[in-house]
A protein has these predicted regions:
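An N-terminal, well-structured beta->alpha segment
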Residues: 1-51, 55-56, 136-167
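Proline/glycine-rich low-complexity loops and linkers
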Residues: 64, 119-149, 244-316, 323-324
């Protein structure tokens, strides 16, 4: 939280650790892209990071305006920079901020990199090296033109235009303002934008495109007669999709629809990746298409590694992050929304119709996610449970136990539950999935009982 953990002193410490790491990897000289989302004091944090980097002989490539995380990622790859620093708290409330470090390939830093950086973070953040002690000058860069040009290569904008569909875009006052809508508008596609001004408070709530927070997007869709609403979070790495009738399409289903769509239209069949907590509809589609499935721990960095190795058609998580082949190894909410527009335009079907088609193809899947706060006593007991091998929970017979991340219990009927303890608060996240709405509600209740009994 800003002014608590996220202070000028701690920023100095973190960026100093990054600078030391960069210099250790590139002693002959290096360049680092620095970007941010629209949060309060972001400009000052970028200036501070640039000052520290120059003190270590590293040239800062500064993005002046707020920019989407995937655009920053694409820019550092395009410029062949040696890393990227992004000041963002993504979809978290406005009082939070954070520092994200990306490696030269545009991917989120893997654990071995973050551990190396942590080891180089100084105890004291009161001072930093003298700025420009070696005459290093910063440089200003603009990621928007090249990033939008790349999206034009990926998305069939002429198809969307010819279909005549209208689109509503909601950037949630975030970093994607004037990105998705500018791209669509320049291609001659009717688009209405809401929440398109800078607001460091994001309307007074977390910039997370979900549920009731999309009501103004829905209202704009109804007024404009739009076929689809696309939204992005604070730094535009996550997406929110609203169907023609105002129904929110949960990210699990968006990932499945786009996986099916890309195999059908691009002909790619080189693999698919999903986190352990993401719908098994992806497993079923992979089996249907005879495509290799990669199930990863939660955290997009693992999917990013597979994208870099060209092993995937698409990779994604239930938390609304995805990317595709030949694109950045980073979550891209802008790309996700535009691909949904293309799928609706080409197939001339709503996303719910496309989902029903998938149910007919591979069976029905109903995912659910719940969070439960734990007392110290309950957490201690439950942590021990996570190391056990239960044969059944509340009458559900366990077929297998998966420990890729947390504990995932797969049952005889194909339904499953995954438990993951939060690393920052006394909360357990519970992911459940069954073949019917009623079934997943009952399963989720049984999963809850197993925690507290």
């Amino acid at each position: 939280m800003v002014a608590e953990e996220f202070t000028i002193g701690n920023i100095r410490r973190a960026v100093t650790g990054i600078a030391r790491y960069i210099v250790s990897q590139h002693p002959e000289g290096a360049r680092v892209v620095i970007g941010r989302d629209p949060r309060y004091m972001g400009e000052r944090f970028v200036e501070l990071a640039a000052e520290i980097l120059t003190g270590f002989g590293v040239r800062p490539l500064i993005i002046n305006d707020p920019a989407p995380t995937p655009a920053i990622s694409y820019e550092l790859v395009r410029l062949k920079a040696d890393g990227g620093i992004n000041f963002t708290a993504s979809h978290n409330p406005p009082e939070y901020n954070g520092i994200k470090f990306s490696t030269p390939d545009g991917a989120p830093a893997l654990p071995e990199v973050t551990k190396a950086i942590e080891a180089l973070v100084p105890e004291d953040g009161s001072a930093s090296p003298n700025a420009n002690k070696v005459g290093i000058q910063s440089e200003t860069v603009d990621p928007k033109p090249a990033y939008l040009a790349r999206l034009k290569e990926i998305i069939d904008l002429s198809l969307i235009r010819r279909s005549g569909i209208k689109v509503v875009f909601d950037p949630f006052w975030g970093a994607a303002r004037n990105y998705s809508d500018d791209l669509l508008r320049d291609a001659g596609i009717p688009v209405t934008t809401v929440h398109n001004t800078r607001d460091v408070l994001f309307g007074g709530h977390a910039p997370e495109p979900d549920g009731e927070l999309l009501d103004e997007c829905r209202a704009a869709m109804k007024k404009a007669g739009a076929r689809i609403g696309i939204a992005t979070d604070g730094d535009a790495d996550r997406f929110g999709i609203v169907d023609q009738d105002g129904t929110f399409i949960q990210p699990n289903y968006v990932l499945a629809i786009l996986f099916d769509y890309l195999v059908e239209t691009r002909g790619w069949k080189n693999g698919v990746a999903k986190s352990v907590a993401t719908t098994n509809m992806i497993n079923a589609l992979a089996k249907h298409y005879k495509i290799e499935l990669h199930e990863t721990p939660v955290g997009f960095k693992y999917i990013g590694e597979l994208i870099k190795q060209d092993k995937l058609v698409i990779g994604g998580e239930e938390s609304a992050g995805l990317t595709i082949r030949h694109h950045v190894p980073e979550k891209d909410g802008v790309l996700a929304g535009l691909l949904c527009c293309e799928a609706v335009a080409r197939r001339n079907k709503t996303l719910q119709q496309q989902l029903r088609d998938l149910f007919g193809k591979v069976g029905s899947f109903y995912p659910q996610r719940d969070n439960f706060r734990l007392t110290d006593e309950v957490k201690a007991k439950f942590t021990k449970k996570l190391t056990s091998d239960p044969k059944e929970i509340s009458g559900y017979k366990v077929k297998s136990v998966v420990r890729t991340d947390g504990m995932k219990l797969v049952f005889d009927d194909g339904s499953w539950v995954c438990y993951r303890l939060s690393g920052t608060e006394p909360v357990v996240r519970v992911y459940s999935e069954a073949a019917s709405e009623d079934g997943v509600k009952k399963l989720a209740k049984a999963a809850e009982e197993w925690i507290f009994n």
